[in-house]
A protein has these predicted regions:
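Aromatic side chains
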Residues: 2, 16-18, 82-83, 118
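Glycoside hydrolase catalytic-domain groove-lining segments
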Residues: 6-59
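Substrate-binding cleft of secreted/luminal carbohydrate-active enzymes
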Residues: 46-127
Length: 127
């Protein structure tokens, strides 16, 4: 239930590529397309965040990370929060040097709001 624009600063989604643990390997598009369509219809013009995202380990994880950052940004996301935990599976970016390097490259691309950068947050909110 959307309370209305005057009560909402950002909208966000979360999603995971569970790999073989649940539904098989899924791309960012597989995981987020329906949710992105719905949230953009409900709250057009609001800044978008991917509030939680993760990917199971595998030979394609680094490519999945690169693709996900790019597709999230292309979809309008200004912020992405990685689920950096070893829980049901090892979601962490830091568990593999190649994955960590891919994430660092993707996260330093222009357009992302970075932690502690108040001016970028203000600009993303149109303030």
């Amino acid at each position: 239930l959307y309370p209305g624009d005057s009560y909402v600063d950002w909208v966000a989604l979360d999603g995971y590529n569970w790999g073989a643990l649940k539904w098989g390997w899924q791309s960012f598009t597989d995981v987020f397309t329906m949710g992105l369509k719905e949230i953009k219809a409900i709250a057009p013009g609001k800044p978008l965040a991917i509030a939680e995202i993760g990917c199971t380990p595998g030979t394609g994880k680094a490519a999945w990370v690169t693709d996900s950052f790019a597709k999230a940004q292309a979809a309008g996301a200004r912020m992405l929060v990685w689920f950096e935990h070893n829980k049901e599976t090892d979601w962490r970016l830091s568990s593999d040097a190649q994955v960590a390097a891919a994430a660092k490259t993707a996260a330093t691309q222009p357009g992302w709001v970075s932690g502690g950068d108040y001016n970028k947050v203000k600009a993303a909110l149109g303030l």
